[in-house]
Amino acid sequence: MSRRKAGSAPRRVEPAPAANPDDEMEMQDLVIELKPEPDAQPQQAPRLGPFSPKEVSSAGRFGGEPHHSPGPMPAGAALLALGPRNPWTLWTPLTPNYPDRQPWTDKHPDLLTCGRCLQTFPLEAITAFMDHKKLGCQLFRGPSRGQGSEREELKALSCLRCGKQFTVAWKLLRHAQWDHGLSIYQTESEAPEAPLLGLAEVAAAVSAVVGPAAEAKSPRASGSGLTRRSPTCPVCKKTLSSFSNLKVHMRSHTGERPYACDQCPYACAQSSKLNRHKKTHRQVPPQSPLMADTSQEQASAAPPEPAVHAAAPTSTLPCSGGEGAGAAATAGVQEPGAPGSGAQAGPGGDTWGAITTEQRTDPANSQKASPKKMPKSGGKSRGPGGSCEFCGKHFTNSSNLTVHRRSHTGERPYTCEFCNYACAQSSKLNRHRRMHGMTPGSTRFECPHCHVPFGLRATLDKHLRQKHPEAAGEA
């Protein structure tokens, strides 16, 4: 340590000049700055990840922003700057993460598409999309002041299923998709469901939708090998096997009956039903007097038997006759075992004989009346069958056809002599008579009020409770 005298001024020491002025270096900050040569190619660093220096931009900026050089690098860092880029960006592979990007891609922003006018809206303008749908697909001209104020007022979006609230529309949609399993995206293969059509619209479009062209263009007809989807009725959602069946099925909703009869007002929806109906218009061939006399002689000579002898088994009457014609057709045919059920047509052919109660109940009278009124056809017990003039159903014998006709006409020729029961078949009447104890050797219980016999005491008690409740209560 040097000593100096008191009162003496300090001496300034000038720094010694450098030996080589070309190699001078600033020693105050100890900063090293290396500049690449203009002719030399910058050294390329090896890839440190999936992103190259050209693909990844500097941290905190995106493409298109100006790049600012960080300036001189401290010497203590001991890193070489490769070109004009920051070496720290090689270790930071940043990917832009916009709030309105889809979870599986970062190339296209999410858009809301109107299914009617195919207009698209950004996800951030979801309120404008709602207004667009409410106002009937009006053009979107950007958020206005009213829309901006509405977005400011809409501070929270609530899930209607769980009640959870969100402040961003995209988070609400993502919650609906991930937490509740709702599909908020539409793929290319999907198509929006067609709205249900009214009956008038279906009637107008059914010929164009399921016409012959649709059958010709089907995958099965073209031989492409593709499985064809079964057609479905747009009204009742019923699945049909073919488009032709769907076309016929649609007529049940629209009331269309394109097949009309040329002899009567009958109309139907299928051609097969019309062909079946036309068989009912076949007229009965007139019977010769010789055949009529022969049949009457055979009927008088033959013993009385309860078999069916149809005067004209295949004869049917025109549709204009209505229910009266059907009843008349059934009155001339007898059922096997029926206690007298035949009445022949008069000379005019319009009036038919009626069966009285005595003829139904008295077997002797019925056996005497049946040979006189019912001619036999060739001595056969059963005549050939025919088709029903009401529904077209075919029967092999006339007895079944006769019983079937009564289901259309409502005729019940067999009545009980003890009560008001009536039926269309004799077998049902015999079964009913057993309830009254009409079988040989059975015990009868007679009602003290109406004197109706019964075969069982329990049946009589039931009769008293239903028909005479006052007497049953007193007993």
Curated annotation (Swiss-Prot):
UniProt entry keywords in alphabetical sequence: Isopeptide bond, Metal-binding, Nucleus, Repeat, Transcription, Transcription regulation, Ubl conjugation, Zinc, Zinc-finger
Compositionally skewed regions (Polar residues) per UniProt: 354-367
Pfam families: CCHC_BCL-11A, zf-C2H2
Similarity comment: Belongs to the krueppel C2H2-type zinc-finger protein family.
Zinc fingers (C2H2-type), renumbered ranges: 157-180, 231-253, 259-281, 386-408, 414-436, 445-468
Name of this protein: Zinc finger protein 296
Record's compositionally biased regions (Low complexity): 295-313, 326-338
PANTHER family listed in its UniProt record: B-CELL LYMPHOMA/LEUKEMIA 11, ZINC FINGER PROTEIN 296
Annotated stretches, region: Disordered: 1-78, 275-385
Gene3D superfamilies in the record: Classic Zinc Finger (3.30.160.60)
Glycyl lysine isopeptide (Lys-Gly) (interchain with G-Cter in SUMO2) crosslink, residue number(s): 35
SMART domains found in the cross-reference section: ZnF_C2H2 (SM00355)
UniProt biased composition (Gly residues): 339-351
GO (cellular component) term, any one: nucleus
One term of GO molecular function: RNA polymerase II cis-regulatory region sequence-specific DNA binding
